[in-house]
Amino acid sequence: MSIRQLSIQWKISLLSGLCLLSIVALLVGLSLYRMDHTTQLVEASSTQMLNESGKARIEAQGEAQALAISRQFMDAYQYGNGFARQVLFLREQSEKRFLDAFDLREDLTRQVKAALQANPDLLGLSLVFEANALDNKDALFDHQKELGSNDKGRFSLYWSQPTPGTLTSMALPEADLADTSTGPSGQANNSWFSCPRETLKPCIIEPYFYKIDGQKVLMTSIVFPLLVNGKLIASLSVDINLNSLQALSKLASKELYEGQADVSIVSSAGILAGFSKDVSKLAQRLDQVDVKNGAQLIKLMATGDQPQSLHGHERLKIVTPFKPIPGSKPWGVLLDVP
C-alpha cells in the first residue's frame, strides 16, 4: 500500500513517529557526545592532577634538600660568629691587661687551632688582622709562622683539617691577600679577604678549588668582619668542604625516580657546588654545563624563596632557592627529572 492510500490520520501518526525517532536519535547522539567529552575532560583532569601531584612531590624533595643544606651552612655561620666575638673579647682583654705581643699572638694561634679542632665538620679557619691592627707590632714578627705572622709580620693565620683531627697551619702570605685574579664565578681569588672589608658584613664566597696539603678541595667560605667602634680590624673565615654537598646530591639522585633524576646544588652566581651526574663539572657554571636552560634557571633561582619550574625536552626542572646565611643572595637545589 502506497503512502497516498493511507488515511490522513495514518499519515500524521507516521510523521509523528518519524519525528519522535529523529528526536530520540538526536538525544542519543548528544548523550554519547557528552559522555565522550566528559570522559576526555576527566582524563585530562586526572592527568593534570597526576602531573601536579608529581610536581608537588618533587618540589617537596627539593625543599627538604635545601633545608638540610641550609642547616649545614647555618651551623658553620653560628660557630664562626661566636668565635669572632671571642677573638674581639680576647683582644680587648689583652689591651686592658697590657698583654705582651708575643703572648697575645701565641694565645690567638692556640685559640684558632682549638676552635677548629672542636668542630670536625669544618675544613679550615683563618684569622687575618689588618696591618698593625692587632698590637701595632707587625714589624717585630715578620716570617714568624709559628705565631701566625706572615712575610710582613701581619697576623694572618690559617688552620686547616683535611681530615677530622688532622690539623696543619700556615701564615697566609701578602700575595694571597692581594690576589685579585678572578675565577669562574667572576669573584676575585681574594674575595674571602676583600668581601668583608668592602661590605662590613658577613659574606659567603662562591665555590672554589684550593690546595690543602697537596689535595685540591672544592670549598666555600663564610667570612666575618671584626669591627671595633665601626672600624674593621680583622676578618675571620670559616671554610666548608663542599664534598659533603656532592655526596648529598648523589644520594638524593639515587632516591629520586630510581636514580633517573639529576640533582645539582648551585651557588648564587650559578657555580655548581654539587652535581650528581658528573663530578668533573664541579665549580663550573650551570649555564655552561646546561647551555639550553642554565641561564634561565639561574634567573629563576634569583627570583625569591619559592620553587620555580621549567619544562622542556620531556624533562621537568625544578629549582628551590635557599639563603645559606642571613642576608645573602640565594643558592639553589636543582632537580632534573624525566
Positions of PLM-derived features:
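Extracellular/periplasmic juxtamembrane segments that couple receptor/chemosensory ectodomains to their
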Residues: 222-234, 238-240, 268, 280, ...
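PAS/PAS-like sensory domains
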Residues: 199-205, 259, 302-308
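Extracytoplasmic/secreted envelope proteins and their assembly/folding machinery
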Residues: 59, 77, 109-113, 190-193, ...
